Each structure stands twice: as structure tokens, then as C-alpha cells.
């Protein structure tokens, strides 16, 4: 389906009734470089009072895909209090200052990042999007971004990191298979003929 973004938003907000005082929690999952951050920015613009929780922050200095305990802590705090102030244990251990904060009054929280929709988090999510992008496209995007930002060193170091990352990512996805639990599967590339403000996704489920 190709629909305007408002149709997608209405569908996401209709999937589960959320109790008063708690934000709706929507996971945006997919390969590294698939377009998750771009989608999160789009949804944050069109859904009022939306905060974004990046798994890159939760997983900082944790072993790859072994940070489910940090994600669960964050989601349980959002369920219990409607807000979040969290210093992940690896931040303290490695001297990173500050906190991850979702302020009171936030009505929607987008959990954005590879692994956001992992099986362990499913009971705490209200909606789950999977951004589908081919491996080669995701790798090219991710490498271009990381080299430009210098987050994993120079070009040689970035390529080395991505080979390590994608091996761990494939192993995690082979076991967890998050797309099978997704409420929405969305195309992470711009398709020919897609109009401004349109998104390509699998469309609302029908009985």
C-alpha cells in the first residue's frame, strides 16, 4: 500500500487502548541503516507530544544485542510512572554523564533502533513497526553515515565495525525474528511513483 502518512499514524494509534497517564510506546525496528531514524523523525513531527528513545543510547557500551535488561528497565519505568529518567549501568561504569529523559506529559514514545522490537520487549509495546530494507542498501547507508560522522573511526575502521555489526545483527535476527511480530512492515526506500508525504507499507490488517 502507498498511503499518506496520516493514515499510517491513525492506524498506529488505533492498535491498542492506552491507560490515562501512560504514553503510547511504539517500537521502530529494522536493520542498521534501514531508515528507522528518518521514520522516527517523521512520526515525531506529526504526532503531538512525542518523545524518542534511541536504543543506541540504551545499548551504549553494552555487548551487541545483550542490552534487553536496559530496554526493559526503561519501558517498565514508562509504564509505571508515565515518564523516564534513566542512567544505564554502562554509562556509570564508563563515565558517561547525564540521563536518558522522557518528560511527564509525553503522550507517545518512539523506541527507535535495531532490536527495539525484540521479543523480550513485546509485552510492553503498544505497536511495532519493522522497516524493511535490503542488506546492501542498509550497509551502504550506514557506512556513508558513520564515515561522515566519524563515530566508528576512519573509513577503514568503519568498514571493520560494520562487518562485525552485521554478523551480530544477522545472528540476532535469525533467532529473534522481530518482523514476524510487527504490526506494520514499512518500505525503507523511496519507491518510484511515491508521492510527497506518502509511505509504502503493508496496510491495515483486515479480518
Language-model features and meaning:
Residues 1-19, 123, 131, 144-148, ...:
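NTP-dependent small-molecule kinase module
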Residues 56, 126, 183:
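Receiver (REC) domain switch/active-site residues of two-component response regulators
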Residues 51-111:
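Conserved nucleotide-sensing/catalytic segment adjacent to the nucleotide-binding pocket
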Residues 31:
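P-loop (Walker A) phosphate-binding loop of NTP-binding proteins
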Residues 99-148:
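ATP-dependent NMP and nucleoside kinases share a basic, alpha-helical "lid"
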Residues 36:
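Conserved lysine of the Walker
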Amino acid at each position: 500500500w502507498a498511503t499518506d502518512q496520516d493514515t499510517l499514524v491513525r492506524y498506529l494509534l488505533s492498535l491498542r487502548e492506552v491507560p490515562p497517564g501512560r504514553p503510547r510506546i511504539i517500537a521502530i525496528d529494522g536493520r542498521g541503516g534501514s531508515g528507522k531514524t528518518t521514520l522516527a523523525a517523521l512520526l515525531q513531527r506529526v504526532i503531538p507530544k512525542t518523545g524518542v528513545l534511541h536504543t543506541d543510547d540504551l545499548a551504549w557500551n553494552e555487548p551487541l544485542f545483550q542490552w534487553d535488561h536496559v530496554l526493559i528497565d526503561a519501558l517498565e519505568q514508562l509504564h509505571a510512572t508515565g515518564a523516564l529518567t534513566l542512567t544505564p549501568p554502562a554509562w556509570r561504569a564508563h563515565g558517561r554523564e547525564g540521563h536518558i529523559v522522557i518528560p511527564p506529559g509525553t503522550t507517545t514514545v518512539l523506541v527507535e533502533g535495531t532490536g527495539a522490537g525484540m521479543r523480550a520487549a513485546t509485552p510492553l509495546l503498544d505497536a511495532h513497526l519493522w522497516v524493511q530494507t535490503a542488506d546492501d542498501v542498509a550497509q551502504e547507508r550506514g557506512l556513508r553515515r558513520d564515515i561522515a560522522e566519524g563515530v566508528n573511526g576512519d573509513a577503514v575502521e568503519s568498514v571493520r565495525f560494520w562487518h562485525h555489526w552485521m554478523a551480530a545483527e544477522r545472528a540476532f535476527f535469525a533467532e529473534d525474528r522481530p518482523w514476524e511480530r510487527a504490526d506494520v512492515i514499512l518500505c525503507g526506500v523511496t519507491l518510484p511513483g511515491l508521492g510527497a508525504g506518502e509511505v509504502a507499507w503493508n496496510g491495515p490488517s483486515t479480518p
